[in-house]
């Protein structure tokens, strides 16, 4: 199984799969948590997992991604936030209520500036609507974007957010960050205009530096979408 997973299916053929169907959770609720600092949001992610809480879903977006998604989906995101966590908890109703209280205490201690808890299935779906539309939403504010797929240890999320901001200034290109925060999988979207001389090349170098940073922080070059990035820098990192 390790070989199959590590090679992303390239070193074998699956001829039969046995599935176990899980019962649908009795209750599912989502928290929408805003932060004034991206590093605080990263800290909150690590603190939640360290407390032994495993959310059904935990996504992170930065300020640029928040603005784009809110313009696109009107999901009720806090526009003033520098970072946003969407945290879903499921299970028996009593258990979910208790977990909500624990998670809210953790995120407020980490520096959350706002916390909303879904009060209906419609509101829960609305919380997720913005995140699910983040990629097309970013496509509306930039002619082109380059999406990366690196993964880092969750504890390094605050460091990576600071590194991303520094690289954005260095290359003179905006980046909208969308993360699967629960497993440390990053999807930074580097915004550029291929019709502007040099911007594509800068975006590719920016992307290579992101991947390099992932490796330096103890992560890997790709988390879920296979490695199709073919710059010389990525090839060098892939070879180790």
List where the protein language model places each region:
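Noncatalytic alpha-helical scaffold of FAD-dependent oxidoreductases
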Residues: 1-223, 227-231
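Single conserved hydrophobic/aromatic residue that forms the stacking wall/gate
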Residues: 229, 233-240
């Amino acid at each position: 199984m390790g070989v199959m997973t590590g090679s992303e299916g390239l070193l074998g053929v699956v001829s039969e799969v046995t599935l176990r169907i899980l019962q649908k959770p009795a209750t599912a609720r989502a928290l929408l948590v805003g932060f004034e600092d991206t590093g605080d949001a990263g800290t909150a992610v690590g603190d939640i997992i360290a407390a032994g809480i495993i959310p059904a879903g935990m996504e992170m977006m930065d300020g640029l991604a928040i603005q784009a998604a809110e313009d696109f989906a009107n999901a009720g995101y806090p526009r003033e936030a520098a970072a946003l966590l969407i945290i879903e908890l499921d299970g028996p109703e009593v258990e979910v209520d208790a977990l909500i209280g624990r998670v809210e205490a953790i995120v407020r201690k980490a520096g959350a500036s706002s916390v909303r808890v879904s009060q209906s299935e419609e509101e829960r779906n609305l919380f997720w609507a913005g995140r699910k539309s983040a990629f097309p939403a970013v496509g509306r504010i930039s002619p082109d974007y380059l999406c990366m797929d690196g993964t880092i240890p969750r504890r390094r999320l605050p460091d990576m957010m600071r590194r991303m901001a520094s690289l954005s200034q260095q290359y003179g290109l905006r980046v909208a960050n969308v993360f699967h925060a629960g497993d440390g999988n990053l999807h930074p979207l580097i915004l550029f205009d291929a019709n502007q001389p040099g911007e594509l090349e800068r975006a590719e170098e920016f992307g290579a530096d992101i991947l390099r940073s992932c490796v330096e922080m103890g992560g890997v070059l790709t988390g879920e979408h296979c490695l199709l990035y073919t710059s010389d820098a990525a090839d060098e990192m892939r070879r180790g």
